[in-house]
Amino acid sequence: MEDSSLLSPISLLTIVIFLFILNLMMIIQDFSSSFPFRFHLFFSNAYILFTSIRNNKQNTELPIIKKVVVPNRADIKTSVEEVKAIIDDSEALYECLIEEGEEYLLEKNEMMGKEIVKEAFRLFDENQDGFIDENELKHVLSLLGYDECTKMECRKMVKVYDENRDGKIDFYEFVKLIEKSFS
């Protein structure tokens, strides 16, 4: 019986060829990804040389690719310290933004709430006189499906929130009514 755990020389050769082809494909891919840049660099240099020869310029500088400078250990140490300082600054900025963001959202929520209350008041105040009387209240309640509500009941509802006893609810009283109903 043959031991299947041993690799035959043919299978080893197949693996080596496969790895060689894979390596070649990676080299070609690296070259092809940088090819457009090299193509552009070659033709831009050729154009610069051609125009300098045509214009009789002697010292023409060609664009070159700069080499990457690897920092020494002292530079790395400094940059690590700088990174720590940046992280500390960013944490402080984050905390500040969170606090200001919460305040902004609360203010925005209050503003939106006020706009919603104004719009609700406008819906109740059909004749736009700045007051909600018992007739307007009855009409809106009937639109909302409360048809069984009588004029007398509407008058009682208005009377509960009518602080100045004029028989109508003004915007200030309406805001208080809304605040009481949500608290």
From Swiss-Prot:
Keyword Metal-binding part of the UniProt annotation: yes
Annotated binding of Ca(2+) 1, by residue: D125, N127, D129, E136
Binding, Ca(2+) 2: D162, N164, D166, K168, E173
InterPro entries (alphabetical): EF-hand-dom_pair, EF_Hand_1_Ca_BS, EF_hand_dom, EF_hand_pair_protein_CML-like
CDD domains reported in the protein's UniProt record: EFh
Keyword Metal-binding: yes
Pfam families attached to this UniProt entry: EF-hand_7 (PF13499)
Keywords annotated in UniProt: Calcium, Metal-binding, Repeat
Superkingdom of the organism of origin: Eukaryota
Gene3D superfamilies from the UniProt entry: EF-hand
PANTHER family: EF-HAND CALCIUM-BINDING DOMAIN CONTAINING PROTEIN
Function: Potential calcium sensor.
Protein name: Probable calcium-binding protein CML47
Record lineage: Eukaryota, Viridiplantae, Streptophyta, Embryophyta, Tracheophyta
Gene: CML47
